[in-house]
């Protein structure tokens, strides 16, 4: 139960930090509950399929985050005037899968190389994922982490004031 709570807290922090809700400060802590959940499962849990547990809970986190931040897609209309379920479902499920797969790569790498190298790898793999996500056919830049500061350009362009 505590793993689900940690995953939900992480999803909540991601969602609240988004420009729609306007508290970008929370993005700095959004991965912490997810990383704690992964650490608890990999080190202390008696779960037999730890990799599946980490994948499933990270998918839950990213699914909730995607749902909250891209829920506006439900207003997309079909040519006949009805709401398009596919406009929500495809990005929601696909993007959550890509994000949780990236987190799963971190889990596997950390299992082999240890926590320190795993965390360094996590930063590298997440940045690579976001870069890749900007440059392929199914680009979906809406949920890149840097977008939380879109309403606060002074925060990210601090060097212009120097």
Segments predicted by a language model, with ranges:
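Membrane-embedded alpha-helical bundles of multi-pass enzymes
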Residues: 1-162
């Amino acid at each position: 139960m505590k793993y689900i709570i940690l995953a939900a807290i992480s999803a909540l922090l991601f969602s609240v930090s988004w420009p729609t809700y306007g508290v970008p400060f929370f993005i700095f802590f959004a991965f912490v509950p997810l990383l704690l959940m992964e650490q608890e499962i990999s080190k202390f849990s008696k779960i037999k399929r730890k990799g599946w547990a980490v994948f499933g809970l990270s998918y839950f986190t990213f699914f909730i985050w995607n749902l909250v931040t891209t829920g506006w897609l439900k207003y997309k209309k079909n040519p006949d005037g009805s709401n398009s379920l596919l406009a929500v479902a495809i990005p929601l499920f696909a993007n959550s899968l890509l994000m949780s797969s990236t987190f799963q790569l971190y889990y596997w790498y950390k299992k082999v190389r240890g926590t320190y190298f795993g965390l360094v790898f996590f930063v590298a793999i997440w940045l690579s994922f976001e870069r890749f996500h900007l440059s392929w056919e199914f680009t979906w830049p809406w949920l890149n982490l840097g977008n939380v500061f879109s309403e606060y350009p002074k925060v990210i362009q601090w060097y212009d004031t120097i």
